[in-house]
């Protein structure tokens, strides 16, 4: 039975028994910040089990996509090295919400296994919770399971709970016996971790509610939650012991093997790549993009682990994205969302792999150089941190390499360096004393949506975080009023500036910040005395406020335009709204093209010209989401939210101040676009009078440039193109001459090539090092055609080594073994692939002897 037939048979079986077939939920759990990813079939029904949500059915069945990588459930480091660990898997499940219970759940499971997929009953073993007499009676007396294949197990394996408190209950598990030829013992025995007895189905009987004291109280409506891994049952039905040998994986392994030119399909690296393309593709389908934190960083870790294993297989160019097509052939029919977004997934994977490959070789070279001068058997935490911070190596990728070389990782040292980095970041972001949280500053009523001037009472004065009763002329401090039109810095919008006035008194407000429920006005008392209890007039600077609201409303239009033109995967990652500019950080996998930026800018200006009214409305959070208002991912909102609408074009949850109409923005101009982190881009823009001034200055620069080149402004581009073409031709000529010199130098080196047992070889010292050494090796391999090359470069007290074996000889000689042989003689070690490897050493005095030993090594190791 194919995996597709198995999935369909399972869902059809339960559909025929009154179950609603529920499509797989996304891998990102909805409204559940406690979970990184959907990691079990019951996750989409969690609120139903807790009684907080009602569905239009009491029976359900699904084939739920799941990911276990990162967080509590993390199988990443084992994937590729075991038969059943995966980052991505499908959980077949059936569920009852207060409808049927143990008897029907057990009966359904036995019927499906023995009648539908026709597993021999004598191969099935059953376990129940040790105190669950009801389940035991059903299995033994009603189903008729042989007592010899029945076990009672303790709470560790056979009692399930959602958390420390809440719904919980006993489990019953069904195991398949692969037979005595496979090592391992039955469930509950000392040998149960072997591969002979494999759990295929877990039935959870949710019948209790555990309270804070640990008491188990019976639930009024017991429920059923079952889970069966599609991959495991497919392996059983297809007669294999390794999930990677099923039809879910073999097309992916074959495709990766074809790309790598590898005939041995059992290589762990092929399994890693086949597993990881499933997880990465569906995470991207469900809206996760590679980034430096949270879910995006887990995705990045998985992609980079796959790329490194591809490198191990000898793949020298981006390849991972090419596996999306065979994945679509395997899973696209069952999950059409993959087919719909296939091109997008390929683009994300290609960009991420390309970015990582730019640092991969440098990182591996750093690691080899370190290992060449260290024989402690441990990769120091400082090196692990440098690989992570400079070269983008996730820690588990370094651990992967360490395992292959029988090394340990200094996790404690790495964590210490990470803690230092976090502390530096915290120190850099701390405010001065006046901005620190004032615990008892009271509460300010904000009136700045309606007015820029208001009368209020001073309810607090602070200097350096200390409460004072009065401020004298010339003193700086913070003033808290009971009501104020000053907007306090929040949501990316800077605080208002202005002044606080009374008879003979002027306090210049330079900034406004939140202090709990109060607004703190930071500034300097220029004249008069100010005391707690004084009545004052608070006046916001109209010019800076109007400039700020223009930029804030423009930010909303920019966000909408980015999603319209680049795609709905765009999410806000940060913003700054100030009087003089706006800055917007957003998720996107590549730098937008110039054409895209022009379209985005034009789209925003089109909405400005339309002169939409800007309207604010308060409503329930659920209602706001239903009407399409965008909420910032990861932001916490109250039950009632404020929605800002700019016509029909943009609706966002926002507490900031805005223009009255989009036309008030005047003009929108993008002045810069950069990358701030992997998968995060930044746009800086200006509006209004500042945008007009920028355009006028740009026109002036063009006119001056045209004068310098002695052409009219209309012919400026043509003139620059002519000059550029002339420069390119000259650069090509220079490069041609360089290549000619390099070829002559290479031929000179190859004059020293020898031959042993029919294999040509060259082992010699050259000048320089770093990437130039690798380039020289590649050039010599091309000129040699067939053979073995070892190059050494001595720099001070260090030796750098590279070894290359042409493709026609890699089945007989391995560059990694050769470079280790040479490196050992100069006090070092290294590693790499069959066709290329590199190493470092710390004893240059023996480099000539080490190179001289290459001939004998080739002779001894030819197979």
UniProtKB/Swiss-Prot annotation:
Q: Which cofactor does it need?
A: Zn(2+)
In the record's cofactor note, how is the cofactor described as bound?
Binds 1 zinc ion per subunit.
Q: Reply yes or no: does the keyword Protein biosynthesis apply.
A: yes
Can you cite a GO biological process for this protein? negative regulation of DNA-templated transcription
What intrachain disulfides are recorded? none
Record localization: Cytoplasm
Q: Which residues bind Zn(2+)?
A: 552, 556, 654, 658
Q: Catalyzes what?
A: tRNA(Ala) + L-alanine + ATP = L-alanyl-tRNA(Ala) + AMP + diphosphate
Decide whether keyword Aminoacyl-tRNA synthetase is in the record: yes
| Coiled coil ranges | none
Keywords of this entry = Aminoacyl-tRNA synthetase, ATP-binding, Cytoplasm, Ligase, Metal-binding, Nucleotide-binding, Protein biosynthesis, RNA-binding, tRNA-binding, Zinc
Highest taxon in the source lineage: Bacteria
The EC designation for this entry is 6.1.1.7
Q: What is one GO cellular-component annotation here? A: cytosol
Task: State the family named in the UniProt similarity comment for this chain.
Answer: Belongs to the class-II aminoacyl-tRNA synthetase family.
Q: What is known of its domains?
A: Consists of three domains; the N-terminal catalytic domain, the editing domain and the C-terminal C-Ala domain. The editing domain removes incorrectly charged amino acids, while the C-Ala domain, along with tRNA(Ala), serves as a bridge to cooperatively bring together the editing and aminoacylation centers thus stimulating deacylation of misacylated tRNAs.
The job of this chain, per UniProt, is described as: Catalyzes the attachment of alanine to tRNA(Ala) in a two-step reaction: alanine is first activated by ATP to form Ala-AMP and then transferred to the acceptor end of tRNA(Ala). Also edits incorrectly charged Ser-tRNA(Ala) and Gly-tRNA(Ala) via its editing domain.
The protein depicted here goes by the name Alanine--tRNA ligase
